[in-house]
Amino acid sequence: MDKPKQSFRRHFKPIRRRFKPIRRYLKPIRRHLSPIRSGDRIDYKNMSLISRFISEQGKILSGRVNRLTSKQQRLMTNAIKRARILSLLPFLYNEN
Protein backbone atom coordinates (compact mmCIF):
# COMPACT_ATOMS: atom_id res chain seq x y z
CA MET A 1 0.00 0.00 0.00
CA ASP A 2 2.90 2.25 0.23
CA LYS A 3 3.15 4.09 -3.07
CA PRO A 4 5.94 6.45 -3.74
CA LYS A 5 4.73 10.00 -4.11
CA GLN A 6 5.17 11.26 -7.63
CA SER A 7 5.80 14.81 -8.45
CA PHE A 8 2.69 16.63 -9.60
CA ARG A 9 4.58 18.80 -12.04
CA ARG A 10 6.20 15.88 -13.78
CA HIS A 11 3.02 14.98 -15.65
CA PHE A 12 2.71 18.35 -17.37
CA LYS A 13 4.91 19.81 -20.04
CA PRO A 14 6.53 23.10 -19.14
CA ILE A 15 4.87 26.11 -20.71
CA ARG A 16 7.16 28.14 -22.89
CA ARG A 17 6.48 31.81 -22.63
CA ARG A 18 7.08 34.06 -25.57
CA PHE A 19 8.21 37.47 -24.61
CA LYS A 20 7.52 40.51 -26.73
CA PRO A 21 10.64 42.20 -27.98
CA ILE A 22 11.40 45.52 -26.37
CA ARG A 23 10.87 48.44 -28.71
CA ARG A 24 13.98 50.52 -29.08
CA TYR A 25 12.13 53.57 -30.35
CA LEU A 26 8.61 54.93 -30.43
CA LYS A 27 6.74 55.28 -33.69
CA PRO A 28 6.02 58.88 -34.62
CA ILE A 29 2.38 59.87 -34.32
CA ARG A 30 0.94 60.89 -37.68
CA ARG A 31 -1.52 63.71 -37.46
CA HIS A 32 -3.84 64.08 -40.39
CA LEU A 33 -4.87 67.59 -41.16
CA SER A 34 -8.60 68.04 -40.95
CA PRO A 35 -10.26 69.22 -44.17
CA ILE A 36 -12.46 71.52 -42.09
CA ARG A 37 -10.73 74.70 -40.98
CA SER A 38 -11.33 76.21 -37.58
CA GLY A 39 -13.41 79.05 -39.06
CA ASP A 40 -15.75 76.74 -41.01
CA ARG A 41 -19.06 75.90 -39.39
CA ILE A 42 -20.74 72.61 -40.19
CA ASP A 43 -24.17 73.89 -41.10
CA TYR A 44 -26.85 72.86 -43.58
CA LYS A 45 -26.69 76.32 -45.19
CA ASN A 46 -22.94 76.11 -45.88
CA MET A 47 -23.25 74.46 -49.30
CA SER A 48 -19.63 75.02 -50.34
CA LEU A 49 -18.47 72.95 -47.37
CA ILE A 50 -21.14 70.27 -47.64
CA SER A 51 -20.58 69.65 -51.34
CA ARG A 52 -16.99 68.51 -50.65
CA PHE A 53 -18.24 65.55 -48.60
CA ILE A 54 -20.70 64.14 -51.13
CA SER A 55 -19.79 61.73 -53.91
CA GLU A 56 -20.67 62.21 -57.57
CA GLN A 57 -23.70 59.97 -57.10
CA GLY A 58 -24.93 62.05 -54.17
CA LYS A 59 -23.87 59.65 -51.42
CA ILE A 60 -22.35 60.80 -48.16
CA LEU A 61 -18.68 59.85 -48.10
CA SER A 62 -17.36 57.83 -45.17
CA GLY A 63 -15.29 59.29 -42.37
CA ARG A 64 -12.16 57.48 -43.55
CA VAL A 65 -12.41 59.04 -46.98
CA ASN A 66 -13.25 62.45 -45.53
CA ARG A 67 -10.55 62.27 -42.83
CA LEU A 68 -13.05 63.66 -40.33
CA THR A 69 -13.30 62.84 -36.67
CA SER A 70 -16.34 60.87 -35.56
CA LYS A 71 -17.94 63.99 -34.08
CA GLN A 72 -17.34 66.01 -37.25
CA GLN A 73 -18.67 63.15 -39.40
CA ARG A 74 -21.84 62.95 -37.30
CA LEU A 75 -22.42 66.70 -37.59
CA MET A 76 -21.71 66.62 -41.33
CA THR A 77 -24.16 63.75 -41.89
CA ASN A 78 -26.91 65.60 -40.04
CA ALA A 79 -26.21 68.79 -42.00
CA ILE A 80 -26.39 66.93 -45.32
CA LYS A 81 -29.66 65.25 -44.35
CA ARG A 82 -31.17 68.58 -43.30
CA ALA A 83 -30.09 70.19 -46.58
CA ARG A 84 -31.72 67.33 -48.49
CA ILE A 85 -34.98 67.67 -46.59
CA LEU A 86 -35.06 71.42 -47.21
CA SER A 87 -34.35 70.68 -50.92
CA LEU A 88 -31.03 72.51 -50.89
CA LEU A 89 -29.42 69.26 -52.06
CA PRO A 90 -30.96 66.58 -54.26
CA PHE A 91 -31.43 63.10 -52.83
CA LEU A 92 -30.27 61.51 -56.09
CA TYR A 93 -28.13 62.87 -58.90
CA ASN A 94 -29.04 62.15 -62.51
CA GLU A 95 -26.64 59.95 -64.44
CA ASN A 96 -27.01 62.02 -67.65
Swiss-Prot record:
InterPro entries: Ribosomal_bS18, Ribosomal_bS18_CS, Ribosomal_bS18_sf. Part of the 30S ribosomal subunit. This is Small ribosomal subunit protein bS18c. Gene3D superfamilies: Ribosomal protein S18. HAMAP family: Ribosomal_bS18. It comes from the Eukaryota. One of its GO terms (cellular component) is chloroplast. One of its GO terms (biological process) is translation. PANTHER family: 30S RIBOSOMAL PROTEIN S18, SMALL RIBOSOMAL SUBUNIT PROTEIN BS18M. Keywords: Chloroplast, Plastid, Ribonucleoprotein, Ribosomal protein, RNA-binding, rRNA-binding. SUPFAM superfamilies: Ribosomal protein S18. The keyword Plastid applies. The keyword Cytoplasm does not apply. It comes from Pinus thunbergii (Japanese black pine). It is found in: Plastid, Chloroplast. Its main location: plastid. Belongs to the bacterial ribosomal protein bS18 family. One of its GO terms (molecular function) is structural constituent of ribosome.
